[in-house]
Regions:
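Conserved phosphate-binding loops in nucleotide/dinucleotide-binding enzymes
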Residues: 70-75
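Short loop/hinge segments at the start of secondary-structure elements
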Residues: 78
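Conserved polymerase palm-domain catalytic core
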Residues: 45-60, 64, 96-108, 112-201
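Residues forming anionic-ligand binding surfaces in small-molecule and nucleic-acid pockets
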Residues: 62-65, 89-91
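Non-catalytic regulatory/linker segments of enzymes
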Residues: 4, 8-11, 46-48, 67-68
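Nucleotide/phosphate-binding loop and acidic/charged catalytic motifs
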Residues: 85
């Protein structure tokens, strides 16, 4: 599979998921209308080491208890790049993730998690712990996160681009920008992508 084919596979997943546009105002349908042009531009940016992510759009949704949950909406081209990297990393990380983990994993669903709970119940387990880490994604230590990823991923380009997404910051709907901090890093050419590419999907 070529790098370009891999990027197109990522694009189809992102576009099929729909969702709102980011700070550039480009919606999914608009991106589709100029698909060839947009994808060619993104591919060149990545392969020519010119890719720069844009700040995510900060918006809020109701949690149902009177509080609001912050969301960060990347622009579509950044979502596609993120999906492409995700598809590469998943190949390795799926082999080491805990079997009891079901959240945001391929070929695993809420129904699968419920089935596992039922199995535990039949084995005599009667207690359930309902826990949540408050503001987890807003407060996670990026340096610790990157150290953990680096234990499994040695490629500098992959690590650099993940760090750039973590530190690019957010833009509010009022046009105010807030940075997440972090150190700037040197990105490496997209050609290193090829060593991670699957032979099939």
């Amino acid at each position: 599979m070529t790098k370009k084919r891999h990027l197109h596979c990522a694009a189809q997943k992102v576009l099929n998921n729909g969702g709102c546009g980011g700070i550039d105002g480009v919606e999914v349908e608009e991106f589709r209308e100029n698909y060839t042009k947009n994808m060619s531009a993104l591919y060149r940016q990545l392969t020519e080491d010119r890719y720069e992510p844009q700040p995510v759009l900060r918006t809020y949704i109701s949690k149902g208890n009177g509080e609001q949950r912050p969301l960060g909406i990347p622009v579509i081209k950044d979502r596609i790049a993120q999906q492409a990297v995700k598809q590469i990393l998943e190949i390795h990380f799926e082999e080491i993730f805990c079997d009891c983990s079901y959240g945001f994993r391929p070929n695993r669903s809420t129904e699968d998690a419920i089935k596992k709970v039922e199995e535990y119940k039949e084995q005599g387990y009667n207690w359930v712990l309902d826990a949540d880490v408050k503001s987890y994604f807003d407060t996670i230590d990026h340096e610790i996160l990157m150290e953990l990823i680096a234990e499994e991923v040695s490629d500098g380009w992959i690590l650099d681009i993940i760090r750039s997404w973590l530190t690019i910051g957010v833009m509010t709907e009022q046009g105010k920008r807030r940075n997440n901090g972090g150190n700037s890093t040197r990105r490496r050419n997209f050609s290193t992508f090829s060593k991670y590419l699957p032979t099939s999907l």
